[in-house]
UniProtKB/Swiss-Prot annotation:
Organism, scientific name: Heliobacterium modesticaldum (strain ATCC 51547 / Ice1)
Subunit structure: Homodimer. The tRNA molecule binds across the dimer.
InterPro entries: aa-tRNA-synt_IIb, aa-tRNA-synth_II, aa-tRNA-synth_II/BPL/LPL, Ser-tRNA-ligase_type_1, Ser-tRNA-synth_1_N, SerRS_1_N_sf, SerRS_core, tRNA-bd_arm
PROSITE patterns assigned: AA_TRNA_LIGASE_II
Protein name, UniProt field: Serine--tRNA ligase
Catalytic activity: tRNA(Ser) + L-serine + ATP = L-seryl-tRNA(Ser) + AMP + diphosphate + H(+); tRNA(Sec) + L-serine + ATP = L-seryl-tRNA(Sec) + AMP + diphosphate + H(+)
Amino acid sequence: MLDTKFVRANPEAVQEALQKRGANISLDDFLELDRRRRALVVEVESLKAKRNAVSAEIARRKKAKEDAEALIAEMRQVGDQIKALDDELTRIELDMDNRMLYIPNIPHASVPVGTSEEDNVEVRRWGTPRTFDFPVKAHWDIGEDLNILDFQRGAKISGARFTVYKGLGARLERAVINLMMDTHAQRGYTEVLPPYLVNRQSMLGTGQLPKFAEDMFAVAGTDYYLIPTAEVPVTNLYTNEILDADKLPIHHCAYSACFRAEAGAAGRDTRGLIRQHQFNKVELVKFTRPENSYDELEKLTKDAEHILQLLGLPYRVITLCTGDMGFSAAKTYDIEVWLPSFGAYREISSCSNFEDFQARRANIRFRPSPKAKPEFVHTLNGSGLAVGRTVAAILENCQQPDGSVVIPEALRPYMGVDVIGG
């Protein structure tokens, strides 16, 4: 969440930033509540000072055996006033906190202004899309023809947007995960295997709740949610903690299954592995000092790109515009892999700097020096990578005229075979 003091001091700049994001939010009511809250605080403090003075006078009169009944009645009245004002103050603070939970992060100055994905800016490309001299098949057809992906049985046992991996398809998924985790560990990330169920507070901490509740799978009758990404449990590892400044930055990588309702995705990517209710993903999460976070974003993005380079998959990196960024992000790079059947690049990773937005919600701080006041860390995360989409990209980019798929060299030690089919 944003810093209330910053919003109060810079209302016009914050309102302009929200407009650039396309957020239809007026700060007027929030700022009015803030003015009322501050006035109440002053009034309550004044009444408490008066109560203390009256209490001292009552004690003096009782000691002198003088009548203090009128003052006692006055103190009760002051106490009632304080309670009423405290109750109002609590209601206002809860209202302000709730409103703040719906206000998105402010875009970094380097983020291009725009309203949709059409305004995103390409940063770089790697690799050249392959030219095929035979009809290109989509990954879902390749998977079914090789008997390694079963969409029909996935739908039978669960419903739409679920897939069963079989034989070398299951091994390929596992091999991709292991390559990603081993590579990131070699590049300095500490592996974490997190819970797949988290509580509501964890979802609030990373910004999924309350705004995106319809996209989450909640466990009925409990406080639990299935995680939409390992970002949630890994970021919340340090909720309500003050981190050792000497140990920053902290780099974690985590493999997890991810669960998304995809409430707003009706009719989009209905076939294949691109948009599933359950999918595997490797996540990279960083906790850094504020002054280093944008350097760390560049490194994180390069770490995600490195996996695609190992696999020989063409991709491009784009900077998301203000209107296309996620709710909690201050800046985001999307990495898009080339999918021949689409004739286009498709997202396979989002790498974001959230600055102190998540840390403020989750109360994750560090002490810059031993006697310094704690400050909020900056948090970053990125997919390193989405596993199902990586499998889809391998099947499509590495397909052969005879219907087989050549395994990228980096995966062969994990697969034990060089080719699927053929």
